[in-house]
Amino acid sequence: MGVRRSLAALLAALLGCATSLVALTVAASPAHAAPSGNRDVIVHLFQWRWKSIADECRTTLGPHGFGAVQVSPPQEHVVLPAEDYPWWQDYQPVSYKLDQTRRGSRADFIDMVNTCREAGVKIYVDAVINHMTGTGSAGAGPGSAGSSYSKYDYPGIYQSQDFNDCRRDITNWNDKWEVQHCELVGLADLKTSSPYVQDRIAAYLNELIDLGVAGFRIDAAKHIPEGDLQAILSRLKNVHPAWGGGKPYIFQEVIADSTISTGSYTHLGSVTEFQYHRDISHAFANGNIAHLTGLGSGLTPSDKAVVFVVNHDTQRYEPILTHTDRARYDLAQKFMLAHPYGTPKVMSSYTWSGDDKAGPPMHSDGTTRPTDCSADRWLCEHRAVAGMVGFHNAVAGQGIGSAVTDGNGRLAFARGSAGYAAFNATNTAWTRTFTTSLPDGVYCDVANGTFVDGVCDGPSYQVSGGKFTATVPANGAVALHVEAPGSCGPDGCGTPPGGGDDCTTVTARFHATVTTWYGQEVAVVGSIPELGSWQPAQGVRLRTDSGTYPVWSGAVDLPAGVGFEYKYVKLNRTAPWSGSRAATASPPWMTSGGGCSQNFYDSWR
């Protein structure tokens, strides 16, 4: 199958192609509220290098109002070249040293924490404290910082007596004792009931707190008895004064079932709400979102729930809705940021093809490449929803009201008098006059742009008498809030400042994850002459190499403001081309990039 997208225009945020049916020549801004102090949105920069995270905090996360970054495990881990350095090697600790991991050095880690704090962004560490290494890793060589080990022997840290006696895999998941004392997929299960083990784990976490870490995701928390985990957490220090000086924020990975519920751990901190992931993912994947005002009802209490569309496990092993359906995936993440239930965690990851254990873009020695959102296999999904983080912050504490639906795939609602959002999970645009509680004035559409340092780079809409008219893009959204004033040009609202005339051409950068056979090439073709007018031989050839395969990339200059359709084709030596058009879909309106350029990320299996 090919991948085909229908564009109303290249990019609304750059070219002003989202439209309002209200035409204005003069428009006053409302009395907008001061920026909210609420910053609780977490972004999981999965497998990112420490230096790349520091850069992202400074340039993107801080300015857009993200509250925290969940970083990958920072402790020394196994190194598995025979497995092509899989992502999960990082979840097998060899020691609690921070000296060297695939993501950088201790000094790099410290600089990241300090840089992010200066940007107003907390660091939450993914803490692997239930276990050490697994059976398959024994004999693989020293850890990432050079430490020797065997499955039940870690010189200077743990010996055989520090592990539980049930040295076999969990087989009966209905037996709570077995789930918490036997081995998870062959990983050496620590005897967390031991005061010595509790002290060692607490010392590791306290070292991170001393370096400025503000919180922890407790990996595999349900496999640690509640009392043991409470004993460990009771030993923790207070966090940096910049974060209030209290105890660190704790959220625990608890995949609830009939044996162990999320409620078993909420007295220790927040928990990851996996049922939310299933509910929101199915709803947006199926275009059935009209009922979602009540999302979260019957689940973990909102103040204890960390919610997500996908995480690094579910995108591989429970892939209901992922980046491979980018439009609906981005739309679901935007909805999560607009809805009041839970503490949202946005995913940002990388692509892989076929092999779900594949590590991030890396050098030949297995260390991670710097993140480049326009190259390699990095997806940088959080940038596509960055504008909605400000919406989430601005409407904190406001409930849902004035909800309207149009069939199963369209839903709009107010967040009190602080914001209004509309979502369209269908393949056709939705034009409507919406009734809000917003003060009259002009607002920036942060679903299709961002508002940073007083500048709106997306469309604007005028609210008059509490009403505004908008066309919500197919598989898109519109979102307005009181902390993001907009502006209207001489041609009215619905366009970015300047009327979208700043760019005469736009550089379109295509990044397609495509599996090919030897001798095949990949091209992008489309409905305009610059993309070959659907003629494969005239399309734009994409390139790859051993370091970036299966991601094929290429760029072409296109006329600004011109709508087009495109797809990918495989070019063969023995046949002219192969590939077919897929169903029409709308791409994300806001992806990574800036200036007169736009990135397109797609996957074609």
UniProtKB/Swiss-Prot annotation:
Its cofactor is Ca(2+). Keywords: Calcium, Carbohydrate metabolism, Glycosidase, Hydrolase, Metal-binding, Signal. The keyword Zinc does not apply. Binds 1 Ca(2+) ion per subunit. Residues 1-33 form the signal peptide. Pfam families: Alpha-amylase, Alpha-amylase_C, CBM_20. It catalyses: Endohydrolysis of (1->4)-alpha-D-glucosidic linkages in polysaccharides containing three or more (1->4)-alpha-linked D-glucose units. It comes from the Bacteria. It is an enzyme of class 3 (hydrolase). Coiled coil: none annotated. The active site is at D219, E253. This is Alpha-amylase. Residues 500-605 form the CBM20 domain. Belongs to the glycosyl hydrolase 13 family. Monomer. Ca(2+) binds at N130, D189, H223. PANTHER family: ALPHA-AMYLASE. SMART domains: Aamy (SM00642), Aamy_C (SM00632), CBM_2 (SM01065). Optimum temperature is 65 degrees Celsius. Its EC number is 3.2.1.1. It comes from Thermomonospora curvata. GO terms for biological process: carbohydrate metabolic process. GO terms for molecular function: alpha-amylase activity; metal ion binding; starch binding. Induction: By maltose or maltodextrins, even in the presence of glucose. The record marks D313 as: Transition state stabilizer.
